[in-house]
Amino acid sequence: MKYFSSREDQRNLLEELRGKGFYIAKSIDEIQNVRSGNLAGFTSEDDMPDILQERGDSFVKSVYSAIRLLNQRENGFFLLVGDMFVDRASHAGNVEQVGLETINLDKAIGMALDFAEKEENTLVIVVGGPEASGMTLVEGNLQDRNVVAKWTMPGMIHTGTMVPVFAYGVGSDKFQGIMKNTDLFFRIKNLLFNQ
């Protein structure tokens, strides 16, 4: 929250949001209790903790709350959800965290897909970030949640590996094949504005 209220230019963006009718929630419980209206949720003073720092399922709960609130709008909605935790764990070379963050992200994606299944005029797009550190699964057992991974990039940097784009729902056919990541913007724009 400090990035919104303790700024060099002396603006307090939290107060500006309140002035525009937003409810400012400061915990996942507060976020979940909001039933209508405009919401700005800030669950950490600084950077969000990762899943190994007891963040728990607050990311999944936040996505659920956003979909529930935005779905009340008459003209539909556009929701962009970002998750930097898998990338951060890859840079750190932390196999356990990569796995746990991926499972957490999968739960959030599952909720979005469940929503799209019920609301036929919905498109869900899932885009990977830049691949980091060249993680390779050498062996393991998914049932036991036990894997052995190796990192192929010293220094834990981004690789040149292509990243996946998955789409489900109305217009998903526009997101097939290989494309530049900058093309995603134009394809989404064309769908939103029937171009």
Annotate the PLM regions:
Residues 1-195:
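A post-motif C-terminal structural segment
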